[in-house]
Design a protein with these regions (language model features):
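Phosphate-binding beta-alpha-beta segment of Rossmann-like dinucleotide-binding domains, i.e.
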Residues: 1-3
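Mid-domain Rossmann-like dinucleotide-binding core that forms the NAD(H)/NADP(H) cofactor-binding site
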Residues: 8, 15-16, 21-106, 110
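Glycine- and other small-residue-rich loops at beta-strand/loop junctions that grip anionic moieties
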Residues: 9, 57-60, 81-82, 101, ...
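Conserved donor sugar-nucleotide recognition element shared by glycan-biosynthetic enzymes
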Residues: 35, 129, 182-186
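Glycine-rich cofactor phosphate-binding loops and adjacent beta1-alpha1 units
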Residues: 47-51, 63, 74, 84-86, ...
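Structural detector of well-ordered beta-strand residues that form the stable sheet scaffold
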Residues: 56, 80, 145-147, 173, ...
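C-terminal hydrophobic helical "lid"/dimerization subdomain
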Residues: 118, 122, 134-138, 179, ...
């Protein structure tokens, strides 16, 4: 049975709940259960990115923006954001991206390899398509890592040069929910937010009422927003 997030009341198992301090803003805490945990967790738990690492993120929606926030947190440089939508790239810059590549205007792989002199060391894919994952892999330097957090359809298949994994000592890593332990990592990330080290506010495009939920889904589908928070008192 599913648990509804679009109702005034819901029933959840105790083991699915995370207790947080009252001092945390409850509205913003809603973002930590999925996007932040997945994106930031991929950086600090799965990949354990080191300061000064050359990085890139393919797809800067809610999860991709969270990856950017995580990369800024650990001191990666440069942080290259790749997307087809200008408004998403603008948000990525606010989140901490140092360079932007609009994939609707240029070949993102060629542009990224030119910018970095052969590819980035750690390249994250947060789109959920085999095309984006293939591009992310192609934009990774020799000896580098491609980390995928997107969820493609079960029928999708990825084709990459098999020899490159050995001959170029490449790594392809999967990260599910940021390799997080929720009871450990959600309070940890919330504290980083309270300290001002994790600029989560950039993810919230707007607050909406429960009656506006369908409009919210339309805006999300059109790529107009990163995340929206439903407030029941609007």
């Amino acid at each position: 049975q599913g648990v509804s997030g679009y109702s005034e009341f819901t029933v959840a198992a105790p083991e699915s709940l995370i207790k947080i301090e009252k001092s945390y803003p409850i509205e913003m805490a809603t973002l930590f259960g999925c996007a932040i945990m997945t994106g930031v967790g991929a950086v600090v738990n799965t990949a354990k990115v080191q300061p000064g690492t050359t990085t890139a993120v393919f797809g800067v929606g809610g999860v991709g923006l969270s990856v950017v926030l995580g990369l800024k947190l650990v001191g990666a440089y440069p942080i290259i954001a790749v997307d087809t939508l200008k408004n998403k790239l603008d948000l990525a810059k606010q989140a901490g991206a140092t360079h932007l590549i609009n994939a609707s205007e240029v070949d993102p792989v060629s542009a990224l390899r030119d910018l970095t002199g052969g590819g980035a060391t750690d390249v994250f894919e947060a789109v959920g398509s085999e095309k984006a994952l293939g591009q992310a892999y192609a934009a990774t330097r020799k000896g580098g890592r491609t980390i995928t957090v997107g969820l493609p359809s079960p029928e999708s298949e990825l084709r990459i040069p098999a020899l490159s994994i050995v001959a170029e000592e490449r790594q392809l890593l999967g990260s599910y929910m940021g390799s997080c332990v929720p009871k450990r990592d959600i309070p940890r990330f919330l504290e980083l937010y309270r300290e001002g080290r994790l600029q989560v506010d950039v993810l919230n495009s707007r607050f909406i009422s429960l009656d506006q939920v369908n409009e919210g889904f339309d805006a999300l589908d059109q790529g107009e927003v990163a995340r929206q928070i439903i407030k029941f008192d609007i």
